[in-house]
């Protein structure tokens, strides 16, 4: 039971850190390379 409580307390922390870093990475990619879904007609 103690291991289950440890797992349930660690999993939200790790998922919050993971999704937070993923969101920051996506924000920085979109800041450096804006409009990734549109194809430029000329470079």
From Swiss-Prot:
Keywords, comma-separated and alphabetical: Chloroplast, Membrane, Photosynthesis, Photosystem I, Plastid, Thylakoid, Transmembrane, Transmembrane helix
Lineage: superkingdom: Eukaryota
Membrane topology listed for this record: Single-pass membrane protein
Subcellular location: Plastid, Chloroplast thylakoid membrane
Residue ranges crossing the lipid bilayer per the database entry: 7-27
An annotated GO BP: photosynthesis
GO CC annotation terms, alphabetical: chloroplast thylakoid membrane; photosystem I
Primary location group: plastid
Record-linked InterPro entries: PSI_PsaJ, PSI_PsaJ_sf
Pfam family for this entry, one: PSI_PsaJ
PANTHER family membership: PHOTOSYSTEM I REACTION CENTER SUBUNIT IX, PTHR36082
Homology family: Belongs to the PsaJ family.
Protein's job: May help in the organization of the PsaE and PsaF subunits.
Descriptive protein name: Photosystem I reaction center subunit IX
Organism: Aethionema cordifolium
Gene it is expressed from: psaJ
């Amino acid at each position: 039971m103690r291991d289950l409580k440890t797992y349930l307390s660690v999993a939200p922390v790790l998922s919050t850190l993971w999704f937070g870093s993923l969101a920051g990475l996506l924000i920085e990619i979109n800041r450096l390379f804006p409009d990734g879904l549109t194809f430029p007609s000329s470079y």
